[in-house]
Amino acid sequence: MSLPLPPALSELARALPYSRTQWLPIFVGFLIGYPILIRALRYKRHGEMKKKFYFPTRESMAEMTDEEAFLIQKEMAQLEFPFMFLTSGQFALFRTYGIPTISHLLTKTGQFSKPETSFKRYTDTAALIGEMVENSPTSQRAFISVARTRFLHSGYQASGKILDADLLYTLALFAVQPVRFIENFEWRTLSDLELCAIGTFWKSLGDALGISSEILPSGKTGFKDGIQWLEEVDVWSQDYEAKYMVPDPKNRESADQATAMLISNRYEAPTPGWSMVFSTLLAIRKLILRYLSPPRPAALAVSNIAQKPDKDDRYHRMSWDALPFYIRPTFWNRWGPMAWISWLMGHPVPGDLGQKKGPQGDPGNDEGIKDLKDGEMSLPLVWSKYHATTND
């Protein structure tokens, strides 16, 4: 005795040039075959990455270059796990507010603790990091973003207001948070190749920024590969949090403007009910991506910063969170889904606030380039044209 089909499927079956007994196996085959196909396609790209960047053994990964690490991480961030890479980076920034020495400095500067400056400062920070991770380490744009970041930190380092350990902790979060988020919430775990790329990239970026890793166990003798650095900085950052991430009024003062939801910032923990709801949603998302959602094509790679300048030779961000800093007021940006969400939440859309938060932004300057090697001052001031502020 066969089971009756639902009415909608019965109508569809009658409309097809097959009998019911012929159509049902096709439908069942599709239900079984489609998830298998999607899973195969998703893992196929991962296999292609391993062939393109061929490091057959753990020992061979010690030869991974900065450029190779950048390209591997870029594919992860823009094609494989774009949502978790972005979200983990935001949480990494928020998590630093749980360290009193960091939150005290931020509130003293007023950049993160006041509504009128917090979103601007957050956007500038995101833009600097975006320039470093979305452009090749040998590119002019990455070069100048590193130089500007070093300049912004230099005064505070010289005065002792920024601790070397706090800088390493911040660097560590941007390296390990994506790993933690992907391992817990994404449709697959990371391979040793990808872990090595993340460790190699951020260790190299830390060196370029003048952030020492000597405090780590292998810091003075040298790291075998990016994986070893990543593992050691992960353990060290957790120990650092256990020792220094304590409740402090300044933690919350900084986090209030960035909506950080950490217990160390003196916010209440979410109820078990809400935790269960979001855990369930994330588990469902994982299954949908693995078995139902085709892999993201290269044409739809997620990038938060324009790869080419506009007619005025300026670069713009491609998306925004609350206030549309450095967003071009195009028709799509003013009337697309993101604009409607912003409008419903009572936030401005691109173009509403004129030049203050519009396409031109701050003029910027070439400070931060002066401490680099002779002969490199002639580089185009790409980052200056991106208009990040230099006033901390």
UniProtKB/Swiss-Prot annotation:
Keyword check for Endoplasmic reticulum: yes
Annotated signal peptide: none
Class in the EC hierarchy, top level: oxidoreductase
Cytoplasmic-facing ranges: 42-392
Membrane topology term: Single-pass membrane protein
Compositionally biased tracts (Basic and acidic residues): 367-376
Single GO MF annotation: oxidoreductase activity
InterPro entries referenced in this protein's UniProt entry, alphabetically: MPAB
Enzyme Commission code: 1.-.-.-
Name of protein: ER-bound oxygenase mpaB
Species assigned in the record: Penicillium brevicompactum
The gene coding this protein: mpaB
